[in-house]
């Protein structure tokens, strides 16, 4: 019985590892394809309870202050980290251990991985997968592609995905023509896109817009130049 049990366990591990290897290889192939091809949809779009509006736009066609506004608001270390901000994660885990719940500590790369391939919610399993996918995106795509995809798939309202759809919905024009203030107002929607509007900002959100514009000035117009060229 012991020999049979060991044989069964060995066979189980063999099948499991083969399955995981196939999954990893398929994922790498998918990421390689999406490095060059706009994602036709995302897991978040597929799970949306609202009609989806999304229009792809190349990051090269956007004004430089639009990606800067998002980076200033969401992840100022984006050009410097490799997909994961360990300082923010450590702080979030300490808060979790203190009973404050699992708070967001996601980089733009992690948010891209989540929006593209995972599901809503905050738990350690999903956060772990999110972190692993983020490292994969950094290795396969690079910063420019990650930021381009994020700007095109991030949710900005109920069923509104990407800066182009958001700009058309809220400002009746292409994202190519957004002003600095309009870009900052879109950026403040990202943490809670379904409950915020750039036209109905609370005092707190007005403060966040002003803070975002100040951060953009401090970072400088050339802050993302090295990753966008």
Curated annotation (Swiss-Prot):
SUPFAM superfamilies: Lysozyme-like (SSF53955). It catalyses: [GlcNAc-(1->4)-Mur2Ac(oyl-L-Ala-gamma-D-Glu-L-Lys-D-Ala-D-Ala)](n)-di-trans,octa-cis-undecaprenyl diphosphate + beta-D-GlcNAc-(1->4)-Mur2Ac(oyl-L-Ala-gamma-D-Glu-L-Lys-D-Ala-D-Ala)-di-trans,octa-cis-undecaprenyl diphosphate = [GlcNAc-(1->4)-Mur2Ac(oyl-L-Ala-gamma-D-Glu-L-Lys-D-Ala-D-Ala)](n+1)-di-trans,octa-cis-undecaprenyl diphosphate + di-trans,octa-cis-undecaprenyl diphosphate + H(+). It holds the Pfam family Transgly. It is a single-pass membrane protein. Keywords: Cell inner membrane, Cell membrane, Cell shape, Cell wall biogenesis/degradation, Glycosyltransferase, Membrane, Peptidoglycan synthesis, Transferase, Transmembrane, Transmembrane helix. It is found in: Cell inner membrane. InterPro entries: Glyco_trans_51 (IPR001264), Lysozyme-like_dom_sf (IPR023346), PBP_transglycosylase (IPR036950), Pep_trsgly (IPR011812). Its EC number is 2.4.99.28. The keyword Transmembrane helix applies. The keyword Lipid metabolism does not apply. It comes from the Bacteria. Its main location: membrane. Pathway: Cell wall biogenesis; peptidoglycan biosynthesis. GO terms for biological process: cell wall organization; peptidoglycan biosynthetic process; regulation of cell shape. GO terms for molecular function: pentosyltransferase activity; peptidoglycan glycosyltransferase activity. GO terms for cellular component: peptidoglycan-based cell wall; plasma membrane. The chain crosses the membrane at residues 14-34. Belongs to the glycosyltransferase 51 family. Peptidoglycan polymerase that catalyzes glycan chain elongation from lipid-linked precursors. This is Biosynthetic peptidoglycan transglycosylase. The gene is mtgA.
